[in-house]
Curated annotation (Swiss-Prot):
Disruption phenotype: Cells lacking this gene fail to produce coenzyme Q8, and accumulate octaprenylphenol (OPP). The keyword Acyltransferase does not apply. The lineage of its organism: Bacteria, Pseudomonadati, Pseudomonadota, Gammaproteobacteria, Enterobacterales. This is Probable protein kinase UbiB. The keyword Acetylation does not apply. It comes from Escherichia coli (strain K12).
Length: 546
Protein backbone atom coordinates (compact mmCIF):
# COMPACT_ATOMS: atom_id res chain seq x y z
CA UNK A 1 0.00 0.00 0.00
CA UNK A 2 1.15 3.53 -0.77
CA UNK A 3 1.53 6.10 2.04
CA UNK A 4 -1.61 7.82 0.75
CA UNK A 5 -3.60 4.57 0.92
CA UNK A 6 -2.31 3.93 4.46
CA UNK A 7 -3.45 7.40 5.57
CA UNK A 8 -6.84 6.88 3.94
CA UNK A 9 -7.23 3.46 5.57
CA UNK A 10 -6.37 4.96 8.97
CA UNK A 11 -9.01 7.67 8.46
CA UNK A 12 -11.63 5.05 7.50
CA UNK A 13 -10.82 2.88 10.55
CA UNK A 14 -10.89 5.89 12.88
CA UNK A 15 -14.25 6.99 11.44
CA UNK A 16 -15.78 3.53 11.73
CA UNK A 17 -14.60 3.13 15.33
CA UNK A 18 -15.70 6.62 16.39
CA UNK A 19 -19.23 5.63 15.32
CA UNK A 20 -19.03 2.24 17.06
CA UNK A 21 -19.29 0.22 13.87
CA UNK A 22 -17.10 -2.51 15.36
CA UNK A 23 -20.47 -3.88 16.52
CA UNK A 24 -20.82 -5.23 12.98
CA UNK A 25 -17.85 -7.59 13.51
CA UNK A 26 -19.37 -11.05 14.15
CA UNK A 27 -18.31 -12.80 17.34
CA UNK A 28 -16.58 -15.83 15.85
CA UNK A 29 -13.28 -17.56 16.46
CA UNK A 30 -11.87 -16.30 13.16
CA UNK A 31 -12.60 -12.69 14.13
CA UNK A 32 -10.95 -12.95 17.58
CA UNK A 33 -7.67 -11.28 16.44
CA UNK A 34 -9.68 -8.47 14.86
CA UNK A 35 -11.68 -7.91 18.06
CA UNK A 36 -8.53 -7.99 20.22
CA UNK A 37 -6.95 -5.46 17.88
CA UNK A 38 -10.00 -3.24 18.28
CA UNK A 39 -9.66 -3.35 22.11
CA UNK A 40 -6.06 -2.19 21.72
CA UNK A 41 -7.31 1.00 20.05
CA UNK A 42 -8.82 2.23 23.32
CA UNK A 43 -8.15 5.87 22.41
CA UNK A 44 -10.76 5.58 19.58
CA UNK A 45 -13.99 5.10 21.55
CA UNK A 46 -17.54 5.18 20.22
CA UNK A 47 -18.45 8.87 20.44
CA UNK A 48 -22.07 8.37 19.35
CA UNK A 49 -23.47 5.87 21.84
CA UNK A 50 -26.75 7.79 21.98
CA UNK A 51 -27.57 6.81 18.39
CA UNK A 52 -28.82 3.52 16.95
CA UNK A 53 -26.52 1.38 14.79
CA UNK A 54 -28.26 2.20 11.50
CA UNK A 55 -27.98 5.95 12.06
CA UNK A 56 -24.33 5.63 13.09
CA UNK A 57 -23.55 3.71 9.90
CA UNK A 58 -25.25 6.39 7.79
CA UNK A 59 -23.37 9.22 9.51
CA UNK A 60 -20.04 7.40 9.14
CA UNK A 61 -20.56 6.90 5.41
CA UNK A 62 -21.47 10.57 5.00
CA UNK A 63 -18.26 11.55 6.78
CA UNK A 64 -16.17 9.28 4.54
CA UNK A 65 -17.26 11.12 1.41
CA UNK A 66 -18.85 10.62 -2.01
CA UNK A 67 -17.67 7.10 -2.83
CA UNK A 68 -18.98 5.73 0.45
CA UNK A 69 -22.20 7.76 0.27
CA UNK A 70 -23.06 6.31 -3.12
CA UNK A 71 -22.02 2.84 -1.96
CA UNK A 72 -24.40 3.15 0.98
CA UNK A 73 -27.19 4.31 -1.33
CA UNK A 74 -26.69 1.23 -3.48
CA UNK A 75 -26.56 -1.08 -0.44
CA UNK A 76 -29.90 0.33 0.72
CA UNK A 77 -31.51 -1.47 -2.23
CA UNK A 78 -29.95 -4.83 -1.24
CA UNK A 79 -32.11 -5.61 1.76
CA UNK A 80 -30.88 -9.17 1.79
CA UNK A 81 -27.59 -7.78 3.12
CA UNK A 82 -28.95 -5.74 6.04
CA UNK A 83 -31.96 -5.80 8.38
CA UNK A 84 -34.69 -3.20 7.65
CA UNK A 85 -33.66 -0.72 10.37
CA UNK A 86 -30.19 -0.39 8.78
CA UNK A 87 -31.36 -0.43 5.15
CA UNK A 88 -33.91 2.31 5.92
CA UNK A 89 -31.17 4.53 7.33
CA UNK A 90 -28.93 3.92 4.31
CA UNK A 91 -31.79 5.02 2.06
CA UNK A 92 -31.65 8.44 3.77
CA UNK A 93 -28.09 9.11 2.59
CA UNK A 94 -27.95 12.41 0.72
CA UNK A 95 -25.51 12.98 -2.12
CA UNK A 96 -24.79 16.59 -1.12
CA UNK A 97 -21.26 17.83 -0.56
CA UNK A 98 -19.56 21.21 -0.43
CA UNK A 99 -18.93 22.75 -3.87
CA UNK A 100 -15.44 23.10 -5.28
CA UNK A 101 -14.05 26.46 -6.36
CA UNK A 102 -15.99 27.93 -9.29
CA UNK A 103 -12.73 29.19 -10.79
CA UNK A 104 -11.57 25.58 -11.12
CA UNK A 105 -14.85 24.74 -12.84
CA UNK A 106 -14.30 27.63 -15.24
CA UNK A 107 -10.80 26.35 -16.06
CA UNK A 108 -12.18 22.87 -16.77
CA UNK A 109 -14.85 24.29 -19.07
CA UNK A 110 -12.24 26.28 -20.98
CA UNK A 111 -10.02 23.21 -21.32
CA UNK A 112 -12.97 21.17 -22.63
CA UNK A 113 -13.80 23.89 -25.18
CA UNK A 114 -10.34 23.93 -26.74
CA UNK A 115 -8.68 26.46 -24.46
CA UNK A 116 -10.89 29.39 -25.47
CA UNK A 117 -12.27 31.57 -22.66
CA UNK A 118 -15.75 30.80 -21.32
CA UNK A 119 -16.96 34.13 -22.70
CA UNK A 120 -16.33 32.87 -26.24
CA UNK A 121 -19.15 30.34 -25.86
CA UNK A 122 -21.34 31.53 -23.00
CA UNK A 123 -22.79 34.76 -21.65
CA UNK A 124 -23.72 35.41 -18.01
CA UNK A 125 -21.63 32.51 -16.69
CA UNK A 126 -22.32 32.24 -12.95
CA UNK A 127 -19.14 31.46 -11.03
CA UNK A 128 -21.17 30.37 -8.00
CA UNK A 129 -22.54 26.84 -8.56
CA UNK A 130 -26.29 26.30 -8.73
CA UNK A 131 -25.95 22.82 -7.19
CA UNK A 132 -23.19 20.50 -6.05
CA UNK A 133 -22.99 16.72 -5.62
CA UNK A 134 -20.29 14.14 -5.03
CA UNK A 135 -19.39 13.59 -8.69
CA UNK A 136 -20.09 16.95 -10.32
CA UNK A 137 -21.48 20.43 -9.86
CA UNK A 138 -23.66 22.71 -11.99
CA UNK A 139 -23.22 26.32 -13.14
CA UNK A 140 -25.69 28.49 -15.05
CA UNK A 141 -25.05 30.49 -18.22
CA UNK A 142 -26.54 31.51 -21.59
CA UNK A 143 -25.51 30.17 -24.97
CA UNK A 144 -23.83 32.90 -26.97
CA UNK A 145 -25.20 31.44 -30.21
CA UNK A 146 -28.92 31.75 -29.40
CA UNK A 147 -29.26 33.32 -25.95
CA UNK A 148 -30.90 30.24 -24.39
CA UNK A 149 -30.46 29.63 -20.67
CA UNK A 150 -28.40 26.53 -19.94
CA UNK A 151 -26.78 24.66 -17.09
CA UNK A 152 -23.20 23.43 -17.38
CA UNK A 153 -22.38 20.25 -15.47
CA UNK A 154 -18.69 19.77 -14.66
CA UNK A 155 -16.98 16.71 -13.16
CA UNK A 156 -15.07 17.38 -9.94
CA UNK A 157 -11.34 17.79 -10.59
CA UNK A 158 -9.05 14.94 -9.52
CA UNK A 159 -11.96 12.79 -8.32
CA UNK A 160 -10.93 9.67 -10.28
CA UNK A 161 -7.83 8.88 -8.12
CA UNK A 162 -9.96 9.26 -4.97
CA UNK A 163 -12.60 6.92 -6.36
CA UNK A 164 -10.04 4.29 -7.41
CA UNK A 165 -8.27 4.38 -4.04
CA UNK A 166 -11.51 3.99 -2.08
CA UNK A 167 -12.78 1.26 -4.41
CA UNK A 168 -9.56 -0.69 -3.85
CA UNK A 169 -10.20 -0.60 -0.10
CA UNK A 170 -13.86 -1.55 -0.54
CA UNK A 171 -12.80 -4.55 -2.65
CA UNK A 172 -10.46 -5.67 0.14
CA UNK A 173 -13.27 -5.42 2.67
CA UNK A 174 -15.56 -7.38 0.34
CA UNK A 175 -13.05 -10.23 0.08
CA UNK A 176 -13.16 -10.59 3.87
CA UNK A 177 -16.95 -10.94 4.03
CA UNK A 178 -17.11 -14.66 3.02
CA UNK A 179 -14.51 -15.45 5.70
CA UNK A 180 -16.28 -13.51 8.45
CA UNK A 181 -19.93 -14.33 7.76
CA UNK A 182 -21.39 -17.86 7.51
CA UNK A 183 -23.68 -16.67 4.71
CA UNK A 184 -21.06 -14.38 3.18
CA UNK A 185 -20.39 -16.41 0.03
CA UNK A 186 -24.06 -16.43 -1.00
CA UNK A 187 -24.18 -12.64 -0.70
CA UNK A 188 -21.51 -12.34 -3.42
CA UNK A 189 -19.92 -9.21 -1.93
CA UNK A 190 -17.29 -8.88 -4.67
CA UNK A 191 -20.03 -8.87 -7.33
CA UNK A 192 -21.87 -6.17 -5.39
CA UNK A 193 -18.75 -3.98 -5.38
CA UNK A 194 -18.09 -4.69 -9.07
CA UNK A 195 -21.63 -3.64 -9.93
CA UNK A 196 -21.17 -0.47 -7.89
CA UNK A 197 -17.83 0.28 -9.55
CA UNK A 198 -19.39 0.03 -13.02
CA UNK A 199 -22.21 2.40 -12.05
CA UNK A 200 -19.79 4.89 -10.52
CA UNK A 201 -17.36 4.89 -13.45
CA UNK A 202 -20.28 5.33 -15.86
CA UNK A 203 -21.35 8.45 -13.95
CA UNK A 204 -17.91 9.98 -14.53
CA UNK A 205 -18.50 10.00 -18.30
CA UNK A 206 -20.87 12.86 -19.08
CA UNK A 207 -21.01 11.85 -22.75
CA UNK A 208 -22.84 8.74 -21.57
CA UNK A 209 -25.25 10.85 -19.52
CA UNK A 210 -25.78 13.14 -22.52
CA UNK A 211 -26.67 10.16 -24.73
CA UNK A 212 -29.05 8.82 -22.06
CA UNK A 213 -30.82 12.18 -21.79
CA UNK A 214 -31.15 12.48 -25.57
CA UNK A 215 -32.65 8.97 -25.75
CA UNK A 216 -35.15 9.62 -22.93
CA UNK A 217 -36.12 12.95 -24.48
CA UNK A 218 -36.77 11.21 -27.82
CA UNK A 219 -38.84 8.51 -26.11
CA UNK A 220 -41.11 11.10 -24.46
CA UNK A 221 -41.21 13.69 -27.22
CA UNK A 222 -44.59 15.51 -27.14
CA UNK A 223 -45.62 13.44 -24.10
CA UNK A 224 -48.04 15.07 -21.63
CA UNK A 225 -46.45 13.10 -18.77
CA UNK A 226 -42.67 13.71 -18.82
CA UNK A 227 -40.28 16.36 -20.14
CA UNK A 228 -36.52 15.84 -20.45
CA UNK A 229 -34.46 19.03 -20.97
CA UNK A 230 -32.70 19.45 -24.30
CA UNK A 231 -29.01 18.53 -24.42
CA UNK A 232 -26.57 20.49 -26.59
CA UNK A 233 -24.16 17.75 -27.75
CA UNK A 234 -21.81 20.16 -29.55
CA UNK A 235 -20.79 21.50 -26.13
CA UNK A 236 -20.51 18.11 -24.38
CA UNK A 237 -17.44 16.06 -23.54
CA UNK A 238 -16.50 13.36 -21.02
CA UNK A 239 -15.99 15.97 -18.31
CA UNK A 240 -18.65 18.53 -19.25
CA UNK A 241 -22.31 18.53 -20.27
CA UNK A 242 -24.51 21.45 -21.37
CA UNK A 243 -28.29 21.25 -21.30
CA UNK A 244 -31.37 23.45 -21.21
CA UNK A 245 -32.10 25.12 -17.88
CA UNK A 246 -35.51 24.19 -16.52
CA UNK A 247 -37.77 25.81 -13.95
CA UNK A 248 -40.07 23.63 -11.91
CA UNK A 249 -41.33 22.76 -8.46
CA UNK A 250 -39.31 20.06 -6.65
CA UNK A 251 -41.53 16.99 -6.43
CA UNK A 252 -40.78 16.75 -2.70
CA UNK A 253 -42.25 20.25 -2.07
CA UNK A 254 -45.85 19.13 -1.60
CA UNK A 255 -46.92 22.49 -0.13
CA UNK A 256 -45.70 24.38 -3.22
CA UNK A 257 -47.40 21.89 -5.53
CA UNK A 258 -50.70 22.28 -3.69
CA UNK A 259 -50.34 26.07 -3.69
CA UNK A 260 -49.88 25.93 -7.47
CA UNK A 261 -53.19 24.02 -7.74
CA UNK A 262 -51.61 20.76 -8.93
CA UNK A 263 -53.88 17.76 -9.44
CA UNK A 264 -52.04 15.55 -6.93
CA UNK A 265 -53.92 12.34 -7.70
CA UNK A 266 -53.23 12.60 -11.42
CA UNK A 267 -49.60 13.57 -10.76
CA UNK A 268 -49.06 10.50 -8.55
CA UNK A 269 -50.70 8.17 -11.08
CA UNK A 270 -48.65 9.63 -13.91
CA UNK A 271 -45.47 8.87 -12.02
CA UNK A 272 -46.41 5.17 -12.06
CA UNK A 273 -47.42 5.36 -15.73
CA UNK A 274 -44.15 7.06 -16.69
CA UNK A 275 -42.15 4.33 -14.95
CA UNK A 276 -43.99 1.40 -16.53
CA UNK A 277 -43.92 3.11 -19.94
CA UNK A 278 -40.14 3.42 -19.71
CA UNK A 279 -39.72 -0.20 -18.63
CA UNK A 280 -42.20 -2.01 -20.88
CA UNK A 281 -42.60 0.24 -23.92
CA UNK A 282 -39.09 1.62 -24.25
CA UNK A 283 -36.94 -0.98 -22.43
CA UNK A 284 -34.94 2.02 -21.21
CA UNK A 285 -35.64 3.62 -17.84
CA UNK A 286 -34.25 6.43 -15.71
CA UNK A 287 -32.78 4.50 -12.78
CA UNK A 288 -32.03 7.41 -10.43
CA UNK A 289 -35.51 8.86 -9.94
CA UNK A 290 -35.09 10.06 -6.37
CA UNK A 291 -36.91 13.30 -5.42
CA UNK A 292 -33.84 15.47 -6.06
CA UNK A 293 -33.94 14.57 -9.76
CA UNK A 294 -37.66 15.16 -10.34
CA UNK A 295 -39.51 18.44 -10.78
CA UNK A 296 -43.05 19.37 -11.80
CA UNK A 297 -43.80 22.01 -14.42
CA UNK A 298 -45.50 25.20 -13.22
CA UNK A 299 -47.66 25.16 -16.35
CA UNK A 300 -51.07 23.45 -16.54
CA UNK A 301 -51.26 22.26 -12.90
CA UNK A 302 -54.59 20.57 -13.67
CA UNK A 303 -52.73 18.41 -16.22
CA UNK A 304 -49.32 18.14 -14.50
CA UNK A 305 -46.11 17.13 -16.23
CA UNK A 306 -42.92 15.77 -14.65
CA UNK A 307 -39.47 17.12 -15.53
CA UNK A 308 -36.60 14.65 -15.19
CA UNK A 309 -32.91 15.51 -14.87
CA UNK A 310 -29.62 13.70 -14.11
CA UNK A 311 -29.79 10.73 -16.47
CA UNK A 312 -26.41 9.31 -15.49
CA UNK A 313 -27.86 5.98 -14.36
CA UNK A 314 -30.27 4.15 -16.65
CA UNK A 315 -31.46 0.56 -16.82
CA UNK A 316 -32.82 -1.67 -19.55
CA UNK A 317 -34.60 -5.02 -19.73
CA UNK A 318 -34.65 -7.46 -22.62
CA UNK A 319 -37.93 -8.81 -23.98
CA UNK A 320 -37.76 -12.01 -21.92
CA UNK A 321 -37.08 -10.16 -18.65
CA UNK A 322 -40.00 -7.81 -19.33
CA UNK A 323 -42.39 -10.68 -19.99
CA UNK A 324 -41.33 -12.62 -16.91
CA UNK A 325 -41.52 -9.49 -14.77
CA UNK A 326 -45.03 -8.58 -15.94
CA UNK A 327 -46.26 -12.16 -15.51
CA UNK A 328 -44.62 -12.32 -12.07
CA UNK A 329 -46.53 -9.25 -10.90
CA UNK A 330 -49.85 -10.56 -12.23
CA UNK A 331 -49.28 -14.05 -10.79
CA UNK A 332 -48.33 -12.55 -7.43
CA UNK A 333 -51.43 -10.38 -7.17
CA UNK A 334 -53.50 -13.41 -8.21
CA UNK A 335 -51.69 -15.28 -5.39
CA UNK A 336 -50.55 -17.92 -7.86
CA UNK A 337 -47.26 -18.73 -6.12
CA UNK A 338 -46.70 -21.86 -8.20
CA UNK A 339 -46.69 -19.70 -11.32
CA UNK A 340 -44.27 -17.25 -9.67
CA UNK A 341 -41.87 -20.10 -8.83
CA UNK A 342 -42.08 -21.57 -12.34
CA UNK A 343 -41.47 -18.15 -13.92
CA UNK A 344 -38.29 -17.70 -11.88
CA UNK A 345 -37.02 -21.09 -13.12
CA UNK A 346 -38.12 -20.56 -16.74
CA UNK A 347 -36.46 -17.14 -16.87
CA UNK A 348 -33.14 -18.56 -15.68
CA UNK A 349 -33.14 -16.29 -12.63
CA UNK A 350 -32.70 -19.41 -10.46
CA UNK A 351 -30.92 -22.67 -11.44
CA UNK A 352 -32.94 -25.12 -13.59
CA UNK A 353 -32.62 -27.89 -10.98
CA UNK A 354 -34.43 -25.79 -8.34
CA UNK A 355 -37.12 -27.74 -6.48
CA UNK A 356 -40.25 -25.87 -7.61
CA UNK A 357 -42.39 -27.22 -4.75
CA UNK A 358 -39.95 -26.00 -2.10
CA UNK A 359 -39.52 -22.70 -3.91
CA UNK A 360 -43.30 -22.21 -4.13
CA UNK A 361 -43.66 -22.90 -0.39
CA UNK A 362 -40.90 -20.39 0.44
CA UNK A 363 -42.53 -17.70 -1.73
CA UNK A 364 -45.94 -18.39 -0.16
CA UNK A 365 -44.49 -18.15 3.36
CA UNK A 366 -42.88 -14.78 2.68
CA UNK A 367 -45.52 -13.19 0.45
CA UNK A 368 -48.85 -14.37 1.86
CA UNK A 369 -48.64 -12.07 4.92
CA UNK A 370 -48.39 -9.11 2.52
CA UNK A 371 -52.05 -9.64 1.60
CA UNK A 372 -53.08 -8.88 5.18
CA UNK A 373 -52.90 -5.25 4.01
CA UNK A 374 -55.47 -3.67 1.71
CA UNK A 375 -54.44 -4.06 -1.93
CA UNK A 376 -53.97 -0.30 -2.30
CA UNK A 377 -51.27 -0.32 0.42
CA UNK A 378 -49.15 -3.10 -1.07
CA UNK A 379 -45.77 -1.90 -2.35
CA UNK A 380 -44.60 -3.19 -5.74
CA UNK A 381 -41.03 -2.47 -4.71
CA UNK A 382 -41.30 -4.54 -1.56
CA UNK A 383 -43.05 -7.32 -3.50
CA UNK A 384 -40.00 -7.51 -5.78
CA UNK A 385 -37.73 -7.25 -2.77
CA UNK A 386 -39.41 -10.20 -1.03
CA UNK A 387 -39.36 -12.28 -4.20
CA UNK A 388 -35.67 -11.59 -4.88
CA UNK A 389 -34.65 -12.18 -1.27
CA UNK A 390 -36.48 -15.52 -1.30
CA UNK A 391 -34.97 -16.44 -4.67
CA UNK A 392 -31.45 -15.67 -3.40
CA UNK A 393 -31.89 -18.47 -0.84
CA UNK A 394 -32.32 -20.72 -3.89
CA UNK A 395 -29.08 -19.43 -5.47
CA UNK A 396 -30.56 -16.71 -7.64
CA UNK A 397 -27.76 -14.96 -9.50
CA UNK A 398 -27.43 -11.21 -8.94
CA UNK A 399 -29.39 -9.51 -11.74
CA UNK A 400 -28.05 -5.93 -11.93
CA UNK A 401 -30.88 -4.76 -14.19
CA UNK A 402 -33.49 -6.06 -11.73
CA UNK A 403 -31.71 -4.48 -8.74
CA UNK A 404 -31.83 -1.12 -10.56
CA UNK A 405 -35.48 -1.67 -11.42
CA UNK A 406 -36.42 -2.51 -7.83
CA UNK A 407 -34.57 0.55 -6.50
CA UNK A 408 -36.28 2.82 -9.02
CA UNK A 409 -39.68 1.32 -8.26
CA UNK A 410 -39.20 2.07 -4.56
CA UNK A 411 -38.39 5.70 -5.45
CA UNK A 412 -41.46 5.96 -7.69
CA UNK A 413 -43.74 4.49 -5.03
CA UNK A 414 -42.31 6.69 -2.30
CA UNK A 415 -42.81 9.85 -4.37
CA UNK A 416 -46.29 8.76 -5.48
CA UNK A 417 -47.56 8.09 -1.98
CA UNK A 418 -45.99 11.29 -0.68
CA UNK A 419 -47.98 13.20 -3.31
CA UNK A 420 -51.20 11.22 -2.88
CA UNK A 421 -51.29 8.81 0.09
CA UNK A 422 -54.32 6.94 -1.31
CA UNK A 423 -52.44 6.01 -4.50
CA UNK A 424 -53.39 2.47 -5.58
CA UNK A 425 -50.39 1.27 -7.55
CA UNK A 426 -51.96 -2.03 -8.55
CA UNK A 427 -55.09 -0.35 -9.90
CA UNK A 428 -52.91 2.03 -11.91
CA UNK A 429 -50.41 -0.55 -13.17
CA UNK A 430 -52.59 -3.64 -13.74
CA UNK A 431 -54.30 -2.44 -16.97
CA UNK A 432 -50.90 -1.42 -18.34
CA UNK A 433 -49.33 -4.82 -17.56
CA UNK A 434 -52.28 -6.84 -18.89
CA UNK A 435 -52.40 -4.76 -22.07
CA UNK A 436 -48.66 -5.21 -22.59
CA UNK A 437 -48.82 -9.00 -22.14
CA UNK A 438 -51.82 -9.22 -24.47
CA UNK A 439 -49.87 -7.24 -27.05
CA UNK A 440 -47.04 -9.81 -26.94
CA UNK A 441 -49.22 -12.73 -28.10
CA UNK A 442 -51.67 -13.35 -30.92
CA UNK A 443 -51.82 -12.18 -34.53
CA UNK A 444 -50.51 -8.60 -33.97
CA UNK A 445 -47.40 -9.96 -32.26
CA UNK A 446 -46.82 -12.43 -35.13
CA UNK A 447 -47.19 -9.65 -37.71
CA UNK A 448 -44.77 -7.48 -35.75
CA UNK A 449 -42.24 -10.32 -35.51
CA UNK A 450 -42.57 -10.95 -39.26
CA UNK A 451 -41.92 -7.25 -39.97
CA UNK A 452 -38.83 -7.33 -37.77
CA UNK A 453 -37.43 -10.38 -39.58
CA UNK A 454 -38.55 -9.35 -43.09
CA UNK A 455 -35.34 -7.40 -43.95
CA UNK A 456 -33.25 -10.45 -43.04
CA UNK A 457 -35.28 -12.77 -45.30
CA UNK A 458 -35.31 -10.24 -48.14
CA UNK A 459 -31.52 -10.07 -47.92
CA UNK A 460 -31.20 -13.87 -47.92
CA UNK A 461 -33.75 -14.51 -50.70
CA UNK A 462 -31.25 -14.31 -53.61
CA UNK A 463 -29.09 -16.92 -51.88
CA UNK A 464 -31.99 -19.34 -51.37
CA UNK A 465 -31.58 -21.44 -54.59
CA UNK A 466 -27.88 -21.96 -53.88
CA UNK A 467 -28.61 -22.90 -50.25
CA UNK A 468 -31.28 -25.42 -51.36
CA UNK A 469 -28.90 -26.93 -53.96
CA UNK A 470 -26.09 -27.23 -51.39
CA UNK A 471 -28.45 -28.84 -48.90
CA UNK A 472 -29.70 -31.41 -51.44
CA UNK A 473 -26.15 -32.22 -52.58
CA UNK A 474 -24.93 -32.66 -49.01
CA UNK A 475 -28.04 -34.69 -48.24
CA UNK A 476 -27.28 -37.02 -51.16
CA UNK A 477 -23.69 -37.38 -49.98
CA UNK A 478 -24.93 -38.07 -46.47
CA UNK A 479 -27.29 -40.79 -47.71
CA UNK A 480 -24.46 -42.39 -49.71
CA UNK A 481 -22.22 -42.34 -46.63
CA UNK A 482 -24.91 -43.86 -44.44
CA UNK A 483 -25.56 -46.65 -46.98
CA UNK A 484 -21.84 -47.39 -47.22
CA UNK A 485 -21.46 -47.60 -43.46
CA UNK A 486 -24.57 -49.76 -43.19
CA UNK A 487 -23.20 -52.24 -45.81
CA UNK A 488 -19.88 -52.44 -43.96
CA UNK A 489 -21.69 -53.12 -40.71
CA UNK A 490 -23.82 -55.85 -42.29
CA UNK A 491 -20.65 -57.62 -43.58
CA UNK A 492 -19.33 -58.00 -40.07
CA UNK A 493 -20.20 -61.13 -38.08
CA UNK A 494 -21.46 -59.88 -34.76
CA UNK A 495 -22.57 -62.04 -31.88
CA UNK A 496 -25.73 -60.10 -31.22
CA UNK A 497 -28.12 -59.09 -33.96
CA UNK A 498 -29.09 -55.89 -32.24
CA UNK A 499 -25.58 -54.46 -32.57
CA UNK A 500 -26.12 -53.61 -36.26
CA UNK A 501 -29.21 -51.64 -35.35
CA UNK A 502 -27.43 -49.55 -32.73
CA UNK A 503 -24.34 -48.98 -34.88
CA UNK A 504 -26.44 -47.88 -37.85
CA UNK A 505 -28.51 -45.54 -35.74
CA UNK A 506 -25.34 -44.17 -34.16
CA UNK A 507 -23.69 -43.51 -37.51
CA UNK A 508 -26.81 -41.87 -38.89
CA UNK A 509 -27.16 -39.59 -35.91
CA UNK A 510 -23.48 -38.61 -35.91
CA UNK A 511 -23.44 -37.85 -39.63
CA UNK A 512 -26.78 -36.04 -39.44
CA UNK A 513 -25.49 -33.96 -36.58
CA UNK A 514 -22.30 -33.19 -38.52
CA UNK A 515 -24.27 -32.23 -41.61
CA UNK A 516 -26.57 -29.94 -39.65
CA UNK A 517 -23.65 -28.42 -37.78
CA UNK A 518 -22.06 -27.44 -41.10
CA UNK A 519 -25.14 -26.39 -43.05
CA UNK A 520 -27.53 -25.21 -40.36
CA UNK A 521 -25.58 -23.51 -37.53
CA UNK A 522 -28.68 -21.51 -36.59
CA UNK A 523 -30.24 -24.77 -35.29
CA UNK A 524 -28.33 -24.18 -32.04
CA UNK A 525 -27.78 -27.24 -29.85
CA UNK A 526 -29.74 -29.71 -32.04
CA UNK A 527 -26.67 -30.98 -34.02
CA UNK A 528 -24.80 -31.50 -30.76
CA UNK A 529 -27.65 -33.54 -29.30
CA UNK A 530 -27.82 -35.70 -32.46
CA UNK A 531 -24.09 -36.35 -32.38
CA UNK A 532 -24.16 -37.14 -28.66
CA UNK A 533 -27.07 -39.56 -29.19
CA UNK A 534 -25.19 -41.18 -32.06
CA UNK A 535 -22.07 -41.72 -29.96
CA UNK A 536 -24.15 -43.30 -27.19
CA UNK A 537 -25.89 -45.61 -29.67
CA UNK A 538 -22.55 -46.49 -31.27
CA UNK A 539 -21.08 -47.29 -27.85
CA UNK A 540 -24.03 -49.59 -27.05
CA UNK A 541 -23.60 -51.36 -30.39
CA UNK A 542 -19.86 -51.78 -29.82
CA UNK A 543 -20.51 -53.24 -26.37
CA UNK A 544 -22.88 -55.79 -27.87
CA UNK A 545 -20.17 -57.04 -30.27
CA UNK A 546 -17.89 -58.01 -27.40
Amino acid sequence: MTPGEVRRLYFIIRTFLSYGLDELIPKMRITLPLRLWRYSLFWMPNRHKDKLLGERLRLALQELGPVWIKFGQMLSTRRDLFPPHIADQLALLQDKVAPFDGKLAKQQIEAAMGGLPVEAWFDDFEIKPLASASIAQVHTARLKSNGKEVVIKVIRPDILPVIKADLKLIYRLARWVPRLLPDGRRLRPTEVVREYEKTLIDELNLLRESANAIQLRRNFEDSPMLYIPEVYPDYCSEGMMVMERIYGIPVSDVAALEKNGTNMKLLAERGVQVFFTQVFRDSFFHADMHPGNIFVSYEHPENPKYIGIDCGIVGSLNKEDKRYLAENFIAFFNRDYRKVAELHVDSGWVPPDTNVEEFEFAIRTVCEPIFEKPLAEISFGHVLLNLFNTARRFNMEVQPQLVLLQKTLLYVEGVGRQLYPQLDLWKTAKPFLESWIKDQVGIPALVRAFKEKAPFWVEKMPELPELVYDSLRQGKYLQHSVDKIARELQSNHVRQGQSRYFLGIGATLVLSGTFLLVSRPEWGLMPGWLMAGGLIAWFVGWRKTR
